[in-house]
Each structure stands twice: as C-alpha cells, then as structure tokens.
Amino acid sequence: MEEGFRDRAAFIRGAKDIAKEVKKHATKKVVKGLDRVQDEYSRRSYSRFEEEDDDDDFPAPADGYYRGEGAQDEEEGGASSDATEGHDEDDEIYEGEYQGIPRAESGGKGERMADGAPLAGVRGGLGDGEGPPGGRGEAQRRKEREELAQQYEAILRECGHGRFQWTLYFVLGLALMADGVEVFVVGFVLPSAEKDMCLSDSNKGMLGLIVYLGMMVGAFLWGGLADRLGRRQCLLISLSVNSVFAFFSSFVQGYGTFLFCRLLSGVGIGGSIPIVFSYFSEFLAQEKRGEHLSWLCMFWMIGGVYAAAMAWAIIPHYGWSFQMGSAYQFHSWRVFVLVCAFPSVFAIGALTTQPESPRFFLENGKHDEAWMVLKQVHDTNMRAKGHPERVFSVTHIKTIHQEDELIEIQSDTGAWYQRWGVRALSLGGQVWGNFLSCFGPEYRRITLMMMGVWFTMSFSYYGLTVWFPDMIRHLQAVDYAARTKVFPGERVEHVTFNFTLENQIHRGGQYFNDKFIGLRLKSVSFEDSLFEECYFEDVTSSNTFFRNCTFINTVFYNTDLFEYKFVNSRLVNSTFLHNKEGCPLDVTGTGEGAYMVYFVSFLGTLAVLPGNIVSALLMDKIGRLRMLAGSSVMSCVSCFFLSFGNSESAMIALLCLFGGVSIASWNALDVLTVELYPSDKRTTAFGFLNALCKLAAVLGISIFTSFVGITKAAPILFASAALALGSSLALKLPETRGQVLQ
C-alpha cells in the first residue's frame, strides 16, 4: 500500500514537471520570435536563450529530474502543499519587465551599449578595476565624463523627443512662471499696501529690494544644493518655501512680518531659474536643446502677464475685503498676493509626478535609477508615437567613479540634532567645494567672463525696466503740475464746502465762518491764508498742505489733517477733536497711477513675445554667441532712442522696443550657461551667476532711479556702456552649438 502511494506521488510530480517544461519551451519560443522581429530596432542579443537551449537539449537523469539531488528532497517530495501547486519557480519573466539592470558580465558576447559599441569588459562604474581611487588623475575623470556625455546623448536620441519632454516642459514652465510673478508682486501692491501698513518712502524702497535680496540668496543656496541632493528634490523644497511664505504674507498685518515673509518667499523662488533650466536640459538631445530651452523662457513672460492681469482685475475691487475691528484688515491687494502664489502651488503638485534627472543619477553613481528613468522617457514617447512594441535597447550606462566624500553617522551616535549638524556641515562643505571648483584652472576663465556678461546684462536690463515706469510717473507728475489751477486773494464768507478740491493752489485767501464738511482734498495747497471761525468735519486729504496759514477759533472734527500738514502755520484757540485713525503719513492710494503701473507692466512683458519666438527658432541655426551678441548690440542701439522719449506714450513704446530686442540675449545666456558647465557643477554655477544677476539688478535700480527728474543722459550712457561691454565679452566665450551636454 505504501509503495503504491509513493509510485502514485512520483507519477503526479513527474507529470507536473513535464507540463512545466512544455510551458517554458512554448513561452520561450514565442518571446524569441517576437524579439527577433524587433531585432532591427533594438539590436538585442539572444545569448541567454542559446545558453538555456544548450542545457535543455540534455535533460537530467530520471532520478535527479523527478526526485531531486538528495535524500532530503526525496523524503519531502510527497508532502508538497497545495498552496504551492501551480507555482512555477522557473517561469520565464517577460522580456520588457525591469529585472535589475543587466551588467556587462551577464550580457554575454552580444551585449552592446547605447551607441552600439561592445562593452569590452566594462564592469560597474567607469574605471572600476583600474587601480585605487587615489591613483586616478583629473585627466582620467575628464575622459570618463566625455564618454558618459557621448553615450548619454546617444541614449536621448534613442528615447526621442515627444510626450515626456512636453509634459515636463509645462510642469517646469509653471515653476518659471512663479519666478516671473514674484518679481512683480511687490511693485503692484505698494500703491495699496502703503496705506494699510503706513509705509514711508524708505520702507517702500526696502520692500522693493528685499525680494531681490531673497532671490539672490535662494539662487546660490538652491543651485548649490541641487548638484548634491538632486534637481527635483531641491526644486520641490524651494517652491514649497515660496508658496508657504507667500501665503503667510497675504495675512500678516505688520510691516516687519510682511517684509520677513516676502524675504523668505524670495529665497524660495530664487532656486527656480537655475534648477529649471538645468533640469530640463538634461532631458533634451543636442538638436532640440537650444530651441526648447528658449521656448521654456516664454513662461517667465507669461508670469509677468498673469501678475499684471490679476492686479488689474483684483486690486481695484475694494468690496473684496473685510476687517475685524481696527487691528485686522484684509483688503483686495491681499487677495492678489494670495492668487500670485497659485503658479508655485500648481508647480509643486505637477512636479511630484515627474522623475529625477537621470543625468544627476549617473553623476552620483546611481546606474539602476538612471536606467529606469530613461526607460520611462523612451516608453512614454514610443507609446505616444504609436510604437509601443519598441523596446528600450540600452542595457548598460557608464557612471562616474565616486569619491568617498560622505560622512556616515550611526543612528546611535549622539543626539539627533548632533547627527543632523554633522550632516549639514558635511553637505555645506561639499557645496562650497563644488562652488570653488568653478574657479579652478579649467573653468576660471569661463566663470569670470560669464560673471561679466551676467552682471552687465542684469545691470542694464533691470535698471532700465524699473527706470521706465518711474520716468512715466515723472512725466505724469509734470503734466499734472502743468494743469494746476491757482486762486489768488479770494475772500469767502459763510460758505459750506462739501465737494472735492483737486490740483489747486489757494494763495492769500481769507475764509470767515466757513464750513468744510465731507470735503475731499487731493493735491491742494493753501498758502498765506487766514481761517477764522471755521469748522472742518469729516475731511480727507492726500498731498494737501497748509503753508504759512493762520487758524483762529477753528474746530477740526474727525479729520486726517495731521500736524505735519501744517507747515509754518499758527493755530490760535483752535481745537482738534476725534482725529481719524490710521496711517498718519500722506499716501496717494490707488487710482489712475496704479492702473498705469499695471498697464505698462502688462505691455512691457507682452512685448517680449516676438523676441521669444525669434530666439527659439534661430537659437540652433545661428548659434548662442551670435544671438547673445546681436541682441545686446540691438539693445544698446535702442537705448539711444530714449533721448526722444519726452511723452508718456513715447516712453511706453520705447519700453516695449527695449524688452522685445533684449529678451533674445537672455534666452541665449540661459542656454549658454547650461551648456558651458558639466553636470556636477551646472546648477551651482547657474545659481551663483543668477545670484550675481540679482545683485546687479539692485545696483542698477538704485543708480538709474536716482536720476529720475534730473537727467536722462546718465541712464542712457550707463545702459549703453554696460550692454556694449557685455556683448564684447560674450564674443570671447566658446560656442556650444552642436556640442553634447557635458
């Protein structure tokens, strides 16, 4: 009985094994047939199948095949559980699934790299087995990077340009749009916020400059970290910092807290430009890079248009506000600040669906992660083009040999803050060392010349773009003053004034027993006048002064006529009752001037659209240097037309002209910066140069605006000289058109 049971169990197990082998052979033949059809595209080898076929031609002996190799297997054979029935440990894994990246030693004689060349025994990362790391010279590392750059370019060509790149284009475009919005936010809210926060001229100037200071710090900080921690991760963190503090700034009431929030908001958005361009460039093949990086620049313009349109639509709506007593006020300009944080928030949400740069993975020795991302790029593009059957043929990618730089801290070593402190110091040292390497012998000349180009471009561009609106406001003020009405020597008795007085000067007037009730005074001046037995009630004023006037037996009830508005005036037996609360400073508030700021900014940013299109179409045809130098020369020539801008409309037209011709040089400079530095220094160098750009912007704005109302010759001369110097330096830089990404 027992012997019959064993024979039956052996028979069943043998039948299962035979069925399993038949299934494996059938699956193998089908997969091999499909792969051979795809062989022309993928250049895949079939050495794995050949080796297995050789083994299958000689089956194991009966005892070994059915019963296993040892007695233990024989004893346990009949007790196999039903839970494992049907489980096939040798089932063929589908060819397209990720099984771990094949290495050189497992590929056999037919394995090839992305460029079609045999691996020739390469194992692991580049340089493995070539001796100790200490003996590796800089020349060897340079050779490794050149080989990686060539292979990476070939892989990007195989992946193609399609849906993946366009999706990433719009995602990173939102991040760049957030940067464009940030530049305009403070300028748009100042006319409204100055009254809520009672801002003096010095406070307004500091608020305008603090954004550039934050962006300068952020560009250097996030640019350096992105080369060590990753492009995607640092961009997510920087955008999160920007959106959080932009949100807080719309609710805080005090000037100091608002200034602090806008500073940290600027620090967050400062990482946008250096990371976005580096990140996107590492997914673009050489023939597409210049054009599509230029198209990406268009989102900065869209950010400016968005900010101007939202300011125009939201800020004048005073009904969009509420207040809780006199301590907390939420006016429409705060809604505008909140809306301006939306691009950053949307960019964060969209960026979470995107992978890290595969080039960053390869630079840090993460071969498998890079392969997976590149396969995702390939498969996404092939499916979108209607070729889902095409297989990603790359089996091995070169990686850079990694130096032992990181300090590993055990979890039980000291307190948590001590471990984090050591890690932060180590990371800071690596970032600083990477920054200093940009001034090493190999890159010193390029870095110094790029500093000159970035500084001169930013000094002239930001200086002029802020000087233009200030000049327009100055011309408006001159025209407004020319229409001032003067009323000399008037005598008024027993009259009630309950209307608006605007842009008037009253000299030597005498007012007896007059009532000023519900009166609004705008840009009104009373000089050498007498007020006797008069009554002021519910009077509001802006830019209104009483100079050398005398008030006798006069009552002021619920007015905003504060002490500083009485210049060298005498008040005899006069009383102030229940003065208006709020800002004692004289602010103009919103009005036609604010609308003009929105309109001019809207036209100025929209005017760069033709320049963006032209630069994108010609960037890869005429080269980066010609585009940069040519656009700078045209901008320099356009500066001389500023001397003819003697009217408001003429200055607006010249602003649009300057913005339209100068944008091409910015696009070329962004592309050139990306391509001149290797991947391990790209965002560090870009971040440093962008930080220098913000410093030059602060200097340019401060210098150019100081000449408003004095002379136009100095700004024209400074801008022309800076642009001429920048274009001459640009011509000495190496041309990067047609080169692979380092």
UniProtKB/Swiss-Prot annotation:
Phosphothreonine found at: 84
Positions glycosylated per UniProt: 498, 548, 573
PTM: Phosphorylation by CK1 of the N-terminal cytoplasmic domain regulates interaction with SYT1. N-glycosylated.
Entry keyword set: Cell projection, Cytoplasmic vesicle, Glycoprotein, Membrane, Neurotransmitter transport, Phosphoprotein, Synapse, Transmembrane, Transmembrane helix, Transport
Recorded GO MF terms: protein kinase binding; transmembrane transporter activity
Gene Ontology CC terms: cell-cell junction; endoplasmic reticulum; GABA-ergic synapse; glutamatergic synapse; neuromuscular junction; neuron projection; presynaptic active zone; synaptic vesicle membrane
Biased composition (Basic and acidic residues): 32-49
Membrane topology: Multi-pass membrane protein
Extracellular compartment residues: 191-205, 255-262, 316-334, 469-598, 648-651, 709-712
Subcellular location: Presynapse; Cytoplasmic vesicle, Secretory vesicle, Synaptic vesicle membrane
Keyword Transmembrane helix appears in the UniProt entry: yes
Transmembrane segments: 170-190, 206-226, 234-254, 263-283, 295-315, 335-355, 448-468, 599-619, 627-647, 652-672, 686-708, 713-731
Listed Pfam families: LD_SV2 (PF23894), MFS_1 (PF07690), Sugar_tr (PF00083)
Residues modified as Phosphotyrosine: 480
Residues with PTM Phosphoserine: 80-81, 393
Protein task: Plays a role in the control of regulated secretion in neural and endocrine cells, enhancing selectively low-frequency neurotransmission. Positively regulates vesicle fusion by maintaining the readily releasable pool of secretory vesicles.
Family of the protein in this entry: Belongs to the major facilitator superfamily.
Name of the protein this chain belongs to: Synaptic vesicle glycoprotein 2A
Organism: Bos taurus
Record gene name: SV2A
